[in-house]
């Protein structure tokens, strides 16, 4: 190192000059131990700072920067940035690691020497420099250095202090940016801020002496337009050389805090005019490129005619800087004339463990001087724990539980709490008072109304146990109530709203990343302001591309695209376009390089792209943008399941500082990631509302899957191009593909934002949250039970009730998704599924068949909420007894209905409020000339009210709900069943036929073809039923022109929609059929849809059968020929839990494929995701369920091919067969034949045993012809002993007319002259062997599952039975039936008797002419041989008990016992 101006010499050091200091200290310690009093002596400390003026200090800093203080390093290794040693940001631990690289990156300050573009300043470049031969210095043309030019631009910028305070920047319309930097401000006339706007003092961090010492220096604002237009740029303009560098220039974001402005306080010195001229030309060039960008295209994608980049700047705002004075808060005058802090809260956060009793509120505050809203954070402190102690009547000994008989007063309760409880749980200070409270919930021995001891103590003290009891008190309520809940309920805050804070205080230390911060010392200083419109919010739509690292198997982020709208309204229609600005950032993989022509390609396309040469730089840049844009809402797809977790993991892995900028609360310790509940990810983003459109879509619409591609297709009617993860790595091979990949990321962000707008997610969530009174970020996570919980919490708290404590479950139920796709998997473990907790809605037995006359569908409006109102069912009105231990658990205890004279309970009152509010809003929507924005606002509000009201009943029956009340839920459903039965009886009394009913609706067969008459009939029925109720109301829900009713909850119909003038149009409606379920392939669904459309059409029956035959034959041929697209074979099935949690992974195809997807990297599939797979032939003998593959596997592996046999027999055939079941002339075997399958495998017993017995009692079989009766029987076969030809016999006689003769008379081969009757003994033996074979087949006892897709076959009788028979252990969906039932055996034996019954055939089968001919021919010998064969069958049938009815046994119950 050089001696002059060395590092040590240039810095002040705090040094102890006195050498005897240690000795003196020991002497003082010795005297103190001896008892001598020691006085504290204040030493006069000399100043450790050298005081200089601003100009001198700036010159000193520049001298340090210019000094090459490392000897012989040629300026390549280290750089002096001129700062003091205490300017380093010591707050974040990550800096310790980043400092090891000895890079010259700026440390959270703006007085930074910009590093040279020509040589990167990092260790890698130093080693590279040492490895090559040293060359002589070349002359450098400074006029071509745009970074130097940028510094020269700063010469005219405004003067700033050394440690400038943060700048709040709100952007307005800007033109297209420079080729590489979308954040540079183009040369436009600046907006000069008024001089009255004050500058905030610097927000300093603890242990930051330099910042603290200069915090009071205000920023000076000069009206210099030319300086403003240059200095307001976020980063310098970049040139082509930057792409080739590793960590230099603007991509060096190692440790910097990007919210700081990047101006320097420099001394103005003369500048060479040529440099200024060059800079002016550069600006002019940028301006021309901005104009060109509007016309140029980026890259033509598969889905867009022109590149999306051409339209991205249509609504971009101008950039203006807003400066907020943090020396005082932006106060306004309240209603009482006092000065209050008014802000709109959007999100709330609490940390019950590290900061108990503190709630952080995040929102927006209006800055009058800047005419804009900025973010704010309010810390509400000192929220006390509040518990209620219920006194006993008499004192009880806790050890024995005996009643001592001594009465208990409130003073006794206080004394026990003070002496026993407070001391045990270290509650040093508490307040208490006597209060009167009501209770109406499920703890049996709590009185309806009583005096309680209310105790309040600091949240810093421990939480009391929930089951705490004492000698003087029996229960303690409110022990585990969170501070946030206490705050929201006590201050009556219902969702995002305007709040006023009295006596707010400035925050002594920065606690958040918000622009304005305030502290409230008492929660009662917060009050709600009503009837003010919500402010606009900043919305950011996010999309990412990741690649899995082959070594670490971690997802690494390579590209991020984001769209931003700075003034997104929450109470109006979404803006068009839905974004104003955007940014994209692209990184390269560690083992890849950018294409050689990438920089040129970007410049030609004028794309707005930031380049980050490492993932760490990309993440640092992203956090900087998040902080600068400061979004209130971050929108994404599967953002909770993937994006947030990956972002936080990569930020942690790359040791990027200020990770907490992803949210709004400053934190240093990152929460532990990887939990299945996503708890850490949610907390990390606190302060910013996370909107996951996947969760919102699941609540608002029905889709076969909720992948982004499917949502784009269904909602936006567009097609999304998906880039497979392996193609992302390949995209770095050339610029075209790399730019296309980045554009694809941008388009995904646009799709996400458009879907959010299309579904009105934010306004709807806001309305629901305002109704329920919870937190909006929780509403967007889709938890309906929490919404109902908060609505009831507010209602009961306002009515002076003690609310039930949040239940604590020892073993939480595994996260499952409400889906029936995986019914019965691992049933033994989930006992709750075996039997419902109480009886649900009533489903009437359907009258299966096809109806071609008008069917009337009547439906009760909101049945369960209406029942709760009609009968005043509430916690406060229904008397519930304690569950009896003597009664069986299976016995439902239905409580009595409340008396009609009782006052309306809180639950029906709340529902009535919702219903009346919705009715009022719908009336407002009918106003003429209504503003479209207002109409949309009303529509969203009525939807929110409807969603909330309809889900209110659910909290009663949900066992994990805080307001779970099984008796109330059972009473509601019981009344629903009674109402449906009563409705059915009333309709039948009107001489009408009810063909089906389900929970809240009935179907009536009108036997009428006149639509007008049907409506009259419906209105008559409706008025008669509604007379019986005050609030319950039934209405005409629809009219079906034709209906195919298959079974319970499964039907297809043509609904009638009148168009006026007596005309109507029809629309197909499907309920519960296979073709509306997602676990059937598209091929089967299309076949089923076609069959249904044919059946419901007006064509003749023969034409329908013929059309179905043609279609199925065509499908069979197309599948066999391989002309069906692969997408038609995809089967979709949802995961009800995480793939690794399934016990039998191999037997479940979607789980098997899900595990493969997770092993490939990229997005991990989890519970709730829908998996698409195809069944393939892979050369193995495994079952179809184990031959499931993802479509990507099919395309990559040559040995895989579609299993056409499976799709025809297990997908198309079952779907079509079930639909055609009630249709005469079509059966399973016929459908199989049309599809090209073996019909013998599908000769299924279509009718169940119970149906067959009913038919037999009604004489069904006797009405069938012999041909129909024996249609499914196997024919008798006999090989001719002479020629070996197989003869098949199915009747006594062959031929007709004069050619008729016994079937056994001659061999079926014309050339053979042998007669089987000559070998009657052999025929007899063959017949006996066949009979024995069938009897053996019956007694082998094979059982098969009646579900065609299951194909389970077993001889083991399961232990679990249903009403219809033993339940299949394989699928747990259907029952097992005998593969060869007794009726089939009996019918087969009867068939053998039929083909040898000479007398019966002579009398019943042949005509009179043929009968006379047979008698003339004298077949006496043949007749005797036939009778011998028949007698063999008769002997066997005589031993069968199937055809006998034991009358004595049948009527034995009628015998009287003597």
Curated annotation (Swiss-Prot):
Q: Where is this motif: CysB motif?
A: 1345-1371
One GO CC term, this protein: nuclear envelope
The compartments listed are:
Nucleus
Q: Does the keyword DNA damage apply?
A: no
Metal-binding found in the keyword field: yes
Q: Which GO terms describe its biological process?
A: DNA replication; DNA replication initiation; DNA replication, synthesis of primer; DNA strand elongation involved in DNA replication; double-strand break repair via nonhomologous end joining; lagging strand elongation; leading strand elongation; mitotic DNA replication initiation
* Entry-linked Gene3D superfamilies: 2.40.50.730, 3.30.70.2820, DNA Polymerase alpha, zinc finger, DNA polymerase family B, C-terminal domain, Helix hairpin bin, Palm domain of DNA polymerase, Ribonuclease H-like superfamily/Ribonuclease H
Keyword list, A-Z: DNA replication, DNA-binding, DNA-directed DNA polymerase, Metal-binding, Nucleotidyltransferase, Nucleus, Transferase, Zinc, Zinc-finger
Region entry Disordered: which residue ranges? 1-25, 89-119
Query: Catalyzes what?
Result: DNA(n) + a 2'-deoxyribonucleoside 5'-triphosphate = DNA(n+1) + diphosphate
What Enzyme Commission number(s) apply to this enzyme?
Answer: 2.7.7.7
Q: Where is it mainly found?
A: nucleus
Major enzyme class: transferase
The CysA-type zinc-finger regions cover 1280-1310
**InterPro entries noted in UniProt:** DNA-dir_DNA_pol_B, DNA-dir_DNA_pol_B_CS, DNA-dir_DNA_pol_B_exonuc, DNA-dir_DNA_pol_B_multi_dom, DNA/RNA_pol_sf, DNA_pol_a_cat_su_N, DNA_pol_B_thumb, DNA_pol_palm_dom_sf
Give an example GO molecular function.
DNA-directed DNA polymerase activity
The residues that the entry says bind Zn(2+) 1 are: 1280, 1283, 1307, 1312
Q: Which residues bind Zn(2+) 2?
A: 1345, 1350, 1368, 1371
Task: List every stretch annotated DNA-binding.
Answer: 650-715, 1241-1373
Q: What does this protein do?
A: Plays an essential role in the initiation of DNA replication. During the S phase of the cell cycle, the DNA polymerase alpha complex (composed of a catalytic subunit POLA1/p180, a regulatory subunit POLA2/p70 and two primase subunits PRIM1/p49 and PRIM2/p58) is recruited to DNA at the replicative forks via direct interactions with MCM10 and WDHD1. The primase subunit of the polymerase alpha complex initiates DNA synthesis by oligomerising short RNA primers on both leading and lagging strands.
The family line of this record is: Belongs to the DNA polymerase type-B family.
Q: Which PANTHER family match?
A: DNA POLYMERASE ALPHA CATALYTIC SUBUNIT
What more the UniProt record tells us is:
In eukaryotes there are five DNA polymerases: alpha, beta, gamma, delta, and epsilon which are responsible for different reactions of DNA synthesis.
Task: State what protein this is by name.
Answer: DNA polymerase alpha catalytic subunit
Which organism does this sequence originate in? Xenopus laevis
């Amino acid at each position: 190192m050089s001696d002059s101006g060395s590092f040590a010499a240039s810095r002040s050091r705090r040094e102890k000059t006195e050498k005897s200091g240690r000795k003196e200290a020991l002497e003082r310690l010795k005297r103190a131990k001896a008892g001598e009093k020691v006085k504290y002596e204040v030493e006069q400390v000399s100043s450790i700072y050298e005081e200089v003026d601003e100009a001198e200090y700036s010159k000193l800093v520049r001298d340090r920067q210019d000094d090459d203080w490392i000897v012989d390093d040629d300026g390549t290794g280290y750089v002096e940035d001129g700062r003091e040693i205490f300017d380093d940001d010591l707050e974040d631990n990550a800096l310790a690691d980043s400092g090891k690289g000895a890079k010259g990156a700026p440390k959270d300050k703006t007085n930074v020497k910009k590093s040279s573009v020509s040589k990167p300043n990092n260790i890698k470049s130093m080693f590279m420099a040492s490895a090559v031969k040293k060359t002589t210095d070349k002359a450098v043309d400074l006029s071509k250095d745009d970074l130097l030019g940028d510094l020269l631009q700063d010469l005219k910028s405004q003067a700033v202090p050394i440690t400038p305070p943060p700048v709040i920047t709100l952007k307005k319309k800007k033109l297209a940016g420079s080729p590489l930097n979308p954040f540079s401000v183009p040369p436009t006339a600046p907006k000069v801020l008024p001089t009255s706007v004050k500058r905030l003092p610097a927000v300093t961090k603890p242990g930051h002496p330099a910042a603290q010492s200069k915090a009071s220096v205000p920023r000076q604002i000069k009206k210099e337009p030319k300086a403003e237009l240059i200095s307001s740029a976020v980063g310098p303009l970049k040139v082509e050389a930057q792409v080739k560098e590793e960590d230099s220039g603007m991509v060096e974001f190692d440790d910097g805090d990007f919210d700081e402005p990047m101006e320097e306080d420099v001394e103005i010195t003369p500048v060479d005019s040529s440099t200024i001229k060059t800079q002016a030309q550069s600006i002019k060039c940028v301006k021309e490129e901005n104009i060109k960008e509007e016309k140029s295209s980026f890259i033509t994608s598969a889905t867009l005619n022109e590149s999306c980049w051409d339209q991205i700047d249509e609504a971009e705002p101008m950039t203006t800087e807003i400066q907020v004075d943090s020396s005082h808060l932006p106060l306004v005058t309240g209603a009482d004339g006092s000065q209050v802090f008014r802000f709109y809260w959007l999100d709330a956060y609490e940390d019950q463990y590290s900061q108990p009793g503190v709630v952080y509120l995040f929102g927006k505050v209006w800055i009058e001087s800047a005419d804009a809203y900025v973010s704010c954070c309010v810390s509400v402190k000192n929220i006390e724990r509040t518990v209620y102690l219920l006194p006993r009547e008499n004192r009880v000994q806790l050890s024995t539980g005996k009643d001592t008989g001594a009465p208990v007063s409130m003073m006794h309760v206080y004394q026990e709490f003070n002496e026993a409880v407070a001391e045990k749980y270290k509650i040093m200070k508490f307040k208490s008072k006597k209060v009167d409270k009501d209770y109406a919930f499920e703890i049996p021995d709590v009185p309806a109304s009583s005096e309680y001891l209310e105790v309040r103590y600091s949240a810093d003290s421990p939480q009391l146990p929930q089951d705490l009891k004492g000698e003087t008190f029996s229960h303690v309520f409110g022990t585990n109530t969170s501070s946030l809940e206490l705050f929201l309920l006590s201050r009556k805050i219902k969702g995002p709203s305007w709040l006023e804070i009295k006596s707010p205080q400035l925050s002594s230390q920065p606690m958040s990343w918000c622009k304005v911060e305030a502290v409230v010392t008492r929660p009662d200083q917060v009050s709600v302001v009503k009837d003010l419109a919500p402010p606009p919010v900043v919305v950011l739509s996010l999309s990412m591309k990741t690649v899995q690292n082959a070594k670490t198997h971690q997802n690494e982020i390579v590209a991020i695209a984001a769209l931003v709208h700075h003034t997104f309204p929450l109470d109006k229609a979404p803006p068009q376009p839905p974004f104003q600005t955007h940014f994209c950032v692209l990184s390269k993989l560690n083992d890849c390089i950018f294409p050689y022509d990438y920089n040129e390609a970007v410049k030609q396309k004028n794309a707005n792209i930031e380049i980050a040469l490492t993932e760490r730089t990309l993440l640092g840049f992203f956090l900087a943008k998040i902080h600068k844009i400061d979004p209130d809402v971050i929108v994404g797809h599967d953002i909770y399941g993937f994006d947030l977790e990956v972002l936080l993991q990569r930020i942690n892995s790359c040791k990027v500082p200020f990770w907490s900028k992803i949210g709004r609360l400053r934190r240093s310790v990152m929460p532990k990631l990887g939990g299945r509940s996503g708890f850490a990810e949610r907390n990390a983003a606190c302060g910013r509302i996370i909107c996951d459109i996947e969760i919102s879509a699941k609540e608002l619409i029905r889709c076969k899957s909720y992948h982004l591609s499917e949502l784009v297709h269904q909602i936006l009617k567009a097609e999304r191009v998906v880039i497979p993860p392996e193609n992302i790595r390949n995209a770095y091979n050339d610029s075209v593909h790399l730019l296309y990949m980045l554009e694809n990321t941008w388009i995904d962000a646009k799709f996400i934002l458009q879907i959010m707008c299309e579904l009105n997610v934010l306004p709807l969530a806001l309305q629901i949250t305002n109704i329920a009174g919870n937190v909006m970020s929780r509403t967007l996570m889709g938890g309906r039970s929490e919404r109902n919980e908060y609505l009831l919490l507010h209602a009961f708290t306002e009515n002076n009730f003690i609310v039930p404590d949040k239940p604590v479950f020892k073993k939480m139920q595994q996260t499952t998704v409400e889906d029936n796709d995986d019914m019965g998997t691992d049933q033994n473990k989930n006992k709750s599924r075996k039997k419902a907790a109480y009886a649900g809605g009533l489903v009437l037995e359907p009258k299966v068949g096809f109806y071609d006359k008008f069917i009337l569908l009547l439906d009760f409006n909101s049945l369960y909420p209406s029942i709760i109102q009609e009968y005043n069912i509430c916690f406060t009105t229904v008397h519930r007894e304690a569950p009896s231990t003597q009664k069986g658990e299976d016995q439902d205890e239905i409580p009595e209905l409340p008396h009609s004279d009782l006052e309306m309970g809180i639950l029906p009152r709340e529902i009535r409020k919702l219903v009346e509010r919705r009715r009022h809003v719908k009336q407002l929507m009918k106003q003429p000339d209504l503003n479209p924005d207002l109409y949309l606002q009303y529509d969203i509000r009525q939807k929110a009210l409807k969603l909330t009201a309809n889900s209110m009943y659910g909290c009663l029956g949900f066992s994990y709900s805080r307001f779970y009340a099984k008796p109330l839920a059972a009473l509601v459903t019981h009344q629903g069943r009674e109402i449906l039965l009563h409705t059915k009886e009333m309709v039948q009394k009107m001489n009408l036929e009810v063909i089906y009913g389900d929970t809240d609706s009935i179907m009536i067969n009108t036997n009428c073809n006149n639509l007008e008459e049907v409506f009259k009939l419906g209105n008559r029925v409706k008025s008669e039923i509604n007379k019986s109720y005050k609030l319950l109301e039934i209405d005409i829900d629809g009219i079906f022109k034709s209906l195919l009713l298959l079974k319970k909850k499964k039907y297809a119909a043509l609904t009638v929609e009148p168009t006026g003038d007596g005309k109507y149009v029809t629309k197909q409606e499907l309920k519960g059929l296979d073709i509306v379920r997602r676990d059937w392939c598209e091929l089967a669904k299309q076949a089923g849809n076609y069959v249904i459309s044919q059946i419901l059409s007006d064509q003749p029956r023969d034409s329908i059968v013929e059309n179905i035959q043609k279609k199925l034959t065509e499908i069979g041929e197309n599948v066999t020929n391989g002309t069906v697209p692969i997408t038609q074979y995809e089967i979709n099935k949802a995961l009800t839990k995480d793939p690794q949690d399934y016990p039998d992974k191999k037997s479940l195809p979607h789980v098997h494929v899900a595990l493969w997807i997770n092993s490939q990297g990229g997005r991990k599939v989890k519970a709730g995701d829908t998996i698409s797979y195809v069944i393939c032939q892979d050369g193995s003998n495994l079952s179809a369920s184990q031959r499931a593959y993802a479509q990507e596997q099919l395309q990559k592996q040559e040995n895989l091919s579609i299993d056409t046999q499976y799709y025809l027999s297990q997908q198309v055939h079952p779907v079509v067969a079930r639909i055609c079941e009630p249709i005469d002339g079509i059966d399973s075997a016929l459908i199989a034949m049309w599809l090209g399958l073996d019909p013998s495998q599908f000769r299924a017993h279509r009718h169940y045993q119970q149906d067959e017995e009913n038919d037999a009692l009604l004489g069904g079989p006797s009405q069938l012809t012999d041909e129909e009766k024996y249609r499914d029987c196997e024919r008798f076969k006999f090989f001719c002993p002479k020629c070996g030809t197989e003869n098949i016999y199915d009747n006594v006689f062959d031929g007709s007319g004069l050619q008729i003769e016994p079937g056994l008379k001659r061999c079926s081969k014309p050339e053979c002259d042998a007669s089987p009757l000559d070998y009657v003994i052999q025929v007899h033996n063959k017949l006996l062997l066949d009979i024995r074979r069938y009897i053996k087949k019956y007694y082998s006892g094979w059982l098969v599952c009646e579900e065609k897709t299951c194909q389970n076959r077993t001889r083991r009788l399961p232990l679990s039975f249903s009403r219809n028979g033993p339940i299949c252990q394989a699928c747990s969906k259907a029952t097992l039936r005998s593969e060869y039932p007794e009726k089939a055996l009996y019918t087969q034996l009867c068939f053998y008797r039929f083909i040898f019954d000479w007398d019966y055939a002579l009398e019943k089968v042949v005509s009179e002419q043929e009968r006379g001919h047979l008698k003339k021919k004298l077949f006496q010998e043949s007749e005797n041989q036939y009778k011998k064969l028949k007698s063999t069958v008769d002997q066997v049938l005589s031993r069968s008990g199937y055809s006998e009815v034991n009358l004595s046994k049948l009527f034995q119950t009628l015998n009287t016992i003597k």
